[in-house]
Amino acid sequence: MVLLIDNYDSFVYNLARYLEELGVEVEVIRNDAVTVAEVVERRPEAVVISPGPCGPGHAGISVDLVRASLGQVPILGVCLGHQVLASATGGAVVRATRPVHGQVARIDHDQGGASASGLFSGIESPLTATRYHSLVVDPETLGDEWRVTARADGGLVMAMAHTRHVAFGVQFHPESVLTVSGHRLLWNFLCAADVVSGPMPVVPDPAPAAQGHHDAVSLGHYRSESIFPDTEDLSSNGLHW
């Protein structure tokens, strides 16, 4: 099972749909409806941290979850989730010089291959992708545990890969209908996480340019839970994967 942390963003169900189209079970839980300990009890095969309308400091359990699970379970952060990964490991998230919302951009990446950034394996560079964000990760604050693997014009960080663990962040939206090779990127993550193997299944063509600000889809049949936590220390102390 892949656990998808919902940071109150309508893109989350696009992510869930793409992952299910790749043949995996997805459980969607909002960032304030579960504790870190409860996530550990679920023993997900991988964790995906969704986009959201806020900064990492207001993303519910997301930062604490990364601190507790990095190196224990594979993690993919998308947009806000990408920023959460940086923030949880000491990186700075700063305001972008120019916010972009719904902009299709060319993303230059490192072509993946056998390196830690295999997220881009089989995907042409530059990649056409959709960006919705006002904040960016400051690459000067990442240290040597993260490697920047993709950039936009001006050198803005668009993706990073952890140098020791299976953890990746992407600032853009692979689940947007205007992003090319979004399914492939998610499949590469699932392969790196050992959730799937072999050739990628045939998936539906993305829908025409979506109606709405966030290319949102119906909640449909995806499983979403509200598990209201009592007051609890969200640190990783005492948690065992």
Segments and roles (model prediction):
Residues 177-241:
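Acyltransferase
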Residues 2-5, 9-77, 194:
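Flexible gly/pro-rich beta->alpha loop and the following alpha-helix that scaffold active-site loops
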Residues 43-121, 186:
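Cysteine-nucleophile active-site neighborhood
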Residues 79, 133, 173:
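Histidine-centered divalent metal-coordination motifs
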Residues 27-33, 108-109, 132, 150-153:
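Short gly/ser/thr-rich secondary-structure transition/capping motifs
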Residues 113-164:
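Catalytic beta-strand/loop cores that center a nucleophilic Ser/Cys/Thr
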Residues 1, 74-76, 92, 128, ...:
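Proline-centered loop/turn at the N-terminus of a beta-strand
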Residues 5, 171-180:
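Phosphate-binding/catalytic loops
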